[in-house]
């Protein structure tokens, strides 16, 4: 985006991500760590050295489709992400992992990402929870008054009618545990290193 505000470190490398993508995965294996590896492969990020960061969506950061975003990652590079992870080795136990986003109307300001992992929650339940959580965090920085005790769908309308939150969304993965196997689910928001983004994409309005 031509309006991106850059923050650079001493070497001049851009440390504020301009692009990201959402992904999810599930893995099943008799070994816990191998199940996690399978989930990373399912999510398309097993070849990166992932570093978990906290919950800020940078100003002007664009969300790319997963298939497009994956093309800008290189094997072995340090890749920042917000990750939710859940695992079980219990038969028939429902697990879920979810990432929620809340995007402000004013893209000069930052948004929020939230992560959540749970037992016994469906995709829809976990997804609504993370969207709600991200929206609440953003609402508190925007001075939006809301009732934390009403249902998310009602609160969602209040947030969006206020004009300061333009969009909320989530990506969620759930699975049911299998006997004698570890099952792992993950959901991620992956920040693409800015030096990997073509200039033509960076300059696009």
PLM regions: where:
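Helix-coil modules at protein/domain termini and other flexible surface or pore-lining loops
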Residues: 5-205
